[in-house]
């Protein structure tokens, strides 16, 4: 069966992608399919090696479409290394064609330097990547500027801090994937503008929505359940091929908005509807946010990040205003096939006076690409490179993993300003068997110095329940409470084994934190190494 906008039968695509994963030795398993509405299907595809960390989601108007979507996203993120972008990759190159530049090297062309260092605040250290062992090199990947096919090197740290997965795509053909990637870029650009500016969007005429039976049927079914559903023109005045569907749950006063994009309106609307229901049942359409008039909260970068992760963030009441920000202006597309769709999208990009850079991947024998449109397709604000750089965690990675090699006072001086609630494995890019927070780490350092009162202040406010036990024993010592008076009570409440471990920690015989790496992390590195074999064979030619 050929789906609208796809260049191969869906069954053929699925079989091909299965073979790709089997060939590289990175097979994955599906979760149970969700099918809440007649034309909405979604699945989760997780790696067998590290299922909580390496996974993709798929959606579609039929079951096979959602399966193909999940496989496509999985291969896209596998082949582009996006699955590994948040992890330390010790003694490994990110890609064979990367270049590790000295500070001040020939990375970024003048136009890109003007964009990413407009205020002159960006330093070379801000461009050091998160993944490698380099501390004094800038690892960059070659991209091709679409307008003139000139190569430029873009630091990985810009890609991971600002763009993450935006603009990644996989397809049966190059242009099919490029249409997907550029459509996604336009969708997220319009979405962020609509949310931050509080734009009120015009509705699509009901007669037009009726002409797309799958979408109309699912809209009507949601309305019958009591939800207030609107199908909205998100083109920002006919500029971008973007649509939205809003859902108000009047029972708990929440609002959720999904977005979709594609040159073909029907495809855009189907994507928007399946996005609305992705990973959801009809029983959990009550976990959304209540709208607000506080637009500073809505436009906050943390809220925008929430919208990027799972579309569930705050929406401002201005979005619901009866006074619309734009006239209804559907875009006009009459072409046929991926080549025409891509040309249509490139014309839109040209109308916005934007340059696009493309990196292509085919070493798994299935096409993937990464597209970036500087000062347009970034998901995170440009000043994150200076004030919220992901590579900050790299600076303390070895301190955390091997703190015995360092002076404890130096460690505390280094981490003192860091938030106690920081998730340590996310911050430094590993997976621990037992994860801990920055506060737990600080407390451990203080315990090594026998600064028990300072450790107590952290432990009592920690989410670490075992830390609470250690805190109680510190209080007993401070208050000179007789052990014999409470030994039986402590054993009854906590158990003898935990009490003995807590005593050992206070005596310096054991550590509060466990730095043992989870097997999932080792499995993930093995996955990376399997890909490396394919990369080397491809790039050598």
Task: Name the predicted role of every residue range.
Residues 1-541:
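Helix-biased "structured C-terminal domain" signature
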């Amino acid at each position: 069966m050929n789906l609208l906008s796809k260049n191969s039968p869906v069954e053929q695509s699925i079989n091909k992608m299965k073979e790709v994963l089997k060939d590289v030795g990175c097979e994955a398993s599906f979760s149970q399919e969700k099918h809440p509405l007649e034309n909405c299907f979604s699945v989760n595809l997780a790696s067998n090696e590290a299922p909580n960390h390496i996974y993709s989601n798929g959606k579609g108007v039929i079951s096979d479409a959602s399966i193909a979507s999940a496989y496509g996203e999985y291969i896209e993120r596998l082949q582009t290394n996006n699955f590994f972008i948040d992890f330390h990759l010790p003694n490994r190159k990110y890609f064979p064609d990367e270049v590790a530049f000295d500070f001040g090297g020939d990375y970024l062309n003048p136009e890109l330097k003007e964009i990413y260092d407009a205020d002159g605040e960006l330093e070379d250290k801000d461009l050091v990547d998160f993944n490698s062992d380099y501390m004094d090199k800038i690892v960059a990947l070659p991209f091709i500027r679409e307008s003139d096919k000139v190569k430029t090197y873009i630091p990985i740290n810009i890609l991971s801090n600002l763009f993450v997965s935006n603009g990644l795509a996989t397809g049966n053909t190059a242009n099919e994937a490029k249409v997907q990637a550029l459509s996604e870029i336009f969708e997220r650009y319009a979405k962020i503008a609509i949310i931050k500016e509080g734009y009120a969007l015009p509705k699509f005429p009901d007669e037009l929505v009726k002409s797309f039976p799958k979408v109309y049927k699912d809209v009507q079914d949601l309305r019958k359940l009591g939800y207030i559903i609107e199908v909205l023109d998100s083109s920002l005045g006919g500029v971008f091929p973007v649509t939205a569907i809003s859902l108000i749950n009047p029972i708990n006063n929440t609002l959720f908005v999904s977005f979709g994009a594609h040159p073909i309106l029907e495809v855009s609307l189907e994507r928007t509807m399946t996005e609305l229901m992705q990973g959801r049942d009809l029983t959990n359409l009550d976990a959304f946010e209540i709208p607000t008039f506080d637009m500073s909260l809505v436009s906050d970068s943390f809220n925008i990040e929430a919208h990027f992760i799972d579309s569930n963030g705050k929406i401002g009441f201005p979005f619901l205003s009866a006074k619309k920000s734009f006239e209804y202006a559907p875009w006009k597309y009459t072409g046929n096939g991926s080549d025409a769709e891509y040309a249509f999208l490139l014309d839109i990009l040209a109308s916005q006076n934007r340059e696009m850079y493309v990196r292509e991947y085919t070493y798994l024998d299935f096409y993937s690409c990464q597209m970036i449109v500087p000062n347009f397709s970034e998901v995170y604000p440009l000043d994150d490179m200076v004030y919220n750089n992901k590579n900050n965690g790299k600076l303390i990675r070895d301190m955390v993993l091997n703190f015995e090699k360092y002076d404890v006072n130096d460690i505390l001086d280094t981490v003192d300003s860091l938030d106690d609630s920081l998730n340590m494995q996310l911050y430094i890019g590993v997976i621990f068997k037992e994860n801990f927070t920055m506060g737990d780490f600080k407390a451990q350092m203080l315990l090594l110095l026998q600064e028990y009162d300072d450790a107590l202040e952290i432990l009592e406010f920690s989410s670490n329940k075992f830390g609470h036990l250690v805190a109680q024993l510190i209080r007993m010592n401070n208050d000179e409470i007789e052990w014999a008076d409470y030994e039986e009570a402590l054993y009854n409440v906590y158990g003898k084994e935990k009490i003995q471990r807590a005593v050992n920690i206070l005596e310096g015989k054991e550590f509060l934190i466990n730095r043992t790496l989870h097997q999932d992390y080792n499995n993930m590195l093995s996955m990376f190494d399997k890909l490396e074999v394919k990369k080397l064979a491809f790039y050598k030619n």
